[in-house]
A protein has these predicted regions:
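Conserved acetyl-CoA-binding loop-helix of GNAT-fold acetyltransferases
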Residues: 90, 95-112
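A conserved beta-strand-loop-helix scaffold within acyl/acetyltransferase catalytic domains
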Residues: 28-82
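C-terminal "cap" of GNAT-fold acetyltransferases
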Residues: 146-174
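Short amphipathic alpha-helix that is part of the acyltransferase structural core
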Residues: 1-37
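Alpha-helical elements of Rossmann-like donor-binding domains used by nucleotide-donor carbohydrate transfer enzymes
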Residues: 16-20, 48, 102, 106
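Conserved beta-strand-loop-alpha-helix junction that forms the acyl-donor binding cleft
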Residues: 107, 120-134
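Conserved acetyl-CoA-binding loop of GNAT-fold acetyltransferases
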Residues: 135-149
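Conserved acetyl-CoA binding element of GNAT-fold acetyltransferases
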Residues: 77-93
């Protein structure tokens, strides 16, 4: 059960994120090799802000990394107005829309209060072949296009930051 989230840039927490990313890399793509996961981490970890979500036993049950960007390629820009969520990982035994939405709500509220410049847009991608994630993202974001990813077609979703915050804060906590 989801308890709380921690926002961090410490090496210890980055290591926890990396371990979870490597362990569950096949949830992004069944073809993602260990080498590709390591390359992803080496290329993106430095620019990423990390969110770890914990259960009541202080075990990591979910992780997210994001950065600010200002272009359609989602390259890092510290002054960008778009928050690009690069990855979200939820432990398989904890996977549910409720866990995702509660952690996502806490993350967006934290970002609203602590990230400057405040983003005006949130963007993320999902494998075209993953119906569960695409259905989940369509609940709160608009499909804005496709791009060729490392392992096939990815659907890009975008949403106004304040609209997303409003949507997530209407959800009840349990």
């Amino acid at each position: 059960m989801y308890s709380h989230s921690v926002f961090t840039t410490s090496d210890t927490e980055r290591a926890k994120f990396s371990a979870m990313f490597i362990t569950y890399r096949e949830h992004f793509s069944k073809q993602m090799s260990l080498e590709e996961a390591l390359i992803y981490l080496l290329t993106n970890l430095e620019q990423s802000s990390i969110v770890l979500s914990f259960n009541e036993h202080q075990q990591v049950i979910a992780a997210m990394n994001y950065w600010l960007t200002s272009d359609d390629e989602f390259t890092y820009d510290a002054n960008g107005g778009c928050l690009y969520i690069s990855s979200v990982i939820i432990h398989p035994e904890q996977r549910s829309s409720r866990v995702f939405m509660q952690g996502f709500r806490d993350s967006i509220n934290y970002i609203d209060q602590h990230v400057f410049p405040k983003p005006h847009t949130v963007a993320f991608a999902a494998q075209d072949s993953n119906p569960y994630v695409n259905k989940l993202y369509r609940k709160f974001a608009t499909f804005s296009g496709q791009r060729e990813g490392f392992h096939g077609l990815e659907n890009i979703y975008m949403v106004n930051f304040n609209d997303l915050k409003y949507f997530l804060n209407r959800l009840k906590s349990k």
